[in-house]
């Protein structure tokens, strides 16, 4: 959930959560969050003005959240526990011979074992913009979503071919909306638990 170094979902969830708290004037929630994860040395003991200034540097204001790029890149998201589930499924249920085509032979008639890797994913992609909008809806932030096109988008498309995994009997179960809900609930729980011990 680091504002500079985390992956797409954690960064967007935290930014939108903080913007919602600011929008609603919930300074207690803002302070709980930044006490747990200070932002460049700024924590809950700083003044409102210092906190606002630091969060604005990361595109977080009471009125809007600004995210990098255009929001157009497409990404695939897999719930982490499902990565583990898919791995266990393959270990327990798949024989190595099922991972390659034995009918393919080289010029000497020898079976070549190639491309026997198994991609794990959902096989579904969603734009970063759509993900941000889903997060805003989940969190309940009523402010504006802005995009800073002067910042890089990164690779425009990242999608795995999961047809081999599907043919071996495993499919994901957690869709993006449910994953966002679960991750946000986990994030809030972490703030509450850690705030009680601080």
Predicted regions and their residues:
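Active-site loop immediately N-terminal to the catalytic Tyr-X3-Lys motif
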Residues: 1
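C-terminal substrate-binding subdomain of Rossmann-fold SDR/epimerase-dehydratase oxidoreductases
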Residues: 12, 16-198
């Amino acid at each position: 959930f680091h504002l500079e170094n985390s992956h797409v979902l954690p960064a967007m969830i935290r930014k939108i959560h903080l913007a919602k708290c600011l929008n609603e004037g919930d300074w207690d929630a803002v302070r709980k969050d930044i006490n747990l994860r200070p932002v460049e040395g700024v924590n809950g003991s700083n003044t409102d003005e210092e906190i606002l200034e630091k969060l604005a540097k990361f595109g977080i204001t009471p009125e809007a959240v600004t995210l990098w790029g255009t929001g157009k890149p497409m990404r695939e998201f897999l719930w982490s526990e499902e990565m583990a589930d898919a791995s266990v499924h393959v270990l327990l249920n798949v024989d190595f011979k099922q991972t390659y085509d034995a009918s393919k032979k080289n010029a000497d008639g020898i079976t070549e074992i190639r491309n026997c890797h198994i991609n794990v994913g959902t096989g579904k992609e969603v734009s970063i913009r759509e993900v941000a909008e889903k997060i805003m809806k989940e969190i309940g932030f009523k402010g504006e979503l802005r995009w800073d096109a002067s910042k890089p988008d990164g690779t425009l498309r990242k999608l795995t071919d999961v047809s081999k995994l599907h043919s071996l009997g495993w499919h994901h179960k957690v869709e993006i909306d449910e994953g966002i809900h679960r991750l946000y609930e986990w994030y809030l729980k972490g703030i509450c638990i850690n705030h009680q011990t601080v």
